[in-house]
Amino acid sequence: MWIKELELKHYRNYDHLLASFSSGLNVFIGNNAQGKTNFLEAIYFLSLTRSHRTRADKELIHFDHSTVSLTGKIQRISGTVDLEINLSDKGRVTKINALKQAKLSDYIGTMMVVLFAPEDLQLVKGAPSLRRKFIDIDLGQIKPVYLSELSHYNHVLKQRNSYLKSAQQIDAAFLAVLDEQLAGYGARVMEHRIDFINALEKEANTHHQAISNGLESLSLSYQSSVVFDKKTNIYQQFLHQLEKNHQKDFFRKNTSVGPHRDDLAFYINGMNANFASQGQHRSLILSLKMAEVSLMKALTGDNPILLLDDVMSELDNTRQTKLLETVIKENVQTFITTTSLDHLSQLPEGIRIFHVTKGTVQIDSDIH
């Protein structure tokens, strides 16, 4: 898939913008604080209905307006789709082909994106919540039902934690009802995650071995707070651990086990990647991003859109070449932001260049 056209009204520093793109490489050049990242954020937002930079929708609204509108024309294998998101103080409205979508899981996945931004370099050593977010964003696009299961799980988790904080003593019967619901939704969330990580590991290891010239292997490990022996037993064993932890959870006023506490570990040649070099970290993250692209295509039959936000300067020539070779080979529409073309080596033919200045975008040329 690829985005043919994007229109922004009152988004960040863009008062009004209408732009069309190449189905291949699109490079946005400009000084810092001109709107390059805002532009990629808008594409990300149109796909996932959320920003990767802020949780406050009001920050997305142009300073002298009260509403935001984003519309995009997406070319999928199945045909052209029109997406629209409108933000106001009354909330958020999402539409597909002018039809309002009642559920998030009905909208997300229509346009898939993979974002590679500087903050992704913290994925290995950062907080576990970063790695859970990484899993959730990818899985939500590949399997929209996952978002529904995760939403139900978080709703019951909130109920259970609220009860634990307010209760003067344990009502075992009431907790048992919440435990059964939490274990049911949680087990399905974990099953989806396990399948996804197993598939991602295969793709990422293939890319990592290519980048390292066969010198390094990459493996991933899903680390669950729920102790289980096999996937088919997760529900029963999760439920048992919830029941076993009633007193502990009551004392701590929160739920001590479940997918909300799970993590993802990375290993290079069997060694925890927390101890890897900076160069190995960059290769690992690059391998993951390329694996996201190839896995989405393998599981959905369509390519995602790749957003490279100011990361090419973080990669040496070898890693840049591997990345560009992959997107060209897989025919992936790619958006790159940079302050200068000097950071980019071996650019292919057929790219479209845009200049970004103070919330305006001008097409420079198509290079053939």
Swiss-Prot record:
Cell compartments where the protein resides: Cytoplasm
Coiled-coil regions listed in the entry: none
Keywords: ATP-binding, Cytoplasm, DNA damage, DNA repair, DNA replication, DNA-binding, Nucleotide-binding, SOS response
Keyword Secreted: no
Primary localization class, coarse: cytoplasm
GO molecular function, one term: ATP binding
Residues that, per the record, bind ATP: 30-37
A single GO BP: DNA synthesis involved in DNA repair
PROSITE patterns in the record: RECF_1, RECF_2
Function recorded in the entry: The RecF protein is involved in DNA metabolism; it is required for DNA replication and normal SOS inducibility. RecF binds preferentially to single-stranded, linear DNA. It also seems to bind ATP.
The family this protein is said to belong to: Belongs to the RecF family.
Database matches in NCBIfam families: recf
Name recorded for this polypeptide: DNA replication and repair protein RecF
Annotated source species: Streptococcus pyogenes serotype M6 (strain ATCC BAA-946 / MGAS10394)
